[in-house]
């Protein structure tokens, strides 16, 4: 009888230990998700910045690579990529280099066609259209005979100008990844079509699917680091071998290149 009681006590203790350990693991995961959200909030607070010239006065995270007199350059990029079934993958987007030293901005509109050869190797065919920004307006620096393309470039809006993450804290059940050796971290969430940012993307782009996207937040650097470094966003609507639809956005604060100073 005593032997049976000992077994029951031992089994009960083992179950309790596993339960407590499991709760500890869950709490640890929740804590890491909260930490990642807090870190992303530092960058996502710039969404929306309707006037891109406001970046001239925004300070980002400065590491040892910055010269003391360098105010830094913001690099912003937004791009929509679509590959309908049976067709090639085409990306359309824009990159701007916002120089805080000279308070000037230049960049390019990019159309990229990605094909795959019979051996499975990908090949890119890129076409760039140089632009500058003045008074928050995008201006092509070379003649563009295609009026439709010219208007697309001139009317282009970056995601940072209309995106909003004030409800980030409400995103639940994220897939969390953290590698302290790099260090790098990410969080992935399944969104609904009622999400504000999803509605904004559908309003601005022809997205040929009713599927709601997954949002992937990616960052590099110490989670406890201050201010904004590099962060990437990806809204994936469809992803498989035959069809792909995704939108990417990134904000990066870097030392200014010498020829840009």
From Swiss-Prot:
Keywords: Cell membrane, Lipoprotein, Membrane, Palmitate, Signal. A lipid is attached at residue 23 (S-diacylglycerol cysteine). Residues 1-22 form the signal peptide. This is Uncharacterized lipoprotein SE_0142. It is found in: Cell membrane. The keyword Membrane applies. InterPro entries: Csa, Csa_sf. It is a lipid-anchor. One of its GO terms (cellular component) is plasma membrane. It comes from the Bacteria. Belongs to the staphylococcal tandem lipoprotein family. Transmembrane segments: none annotated. PROSITE patterns: PROKAR_LIPOPROTEIN. A lipid is attached at residue 23 (N-palmitoyl cysteine).
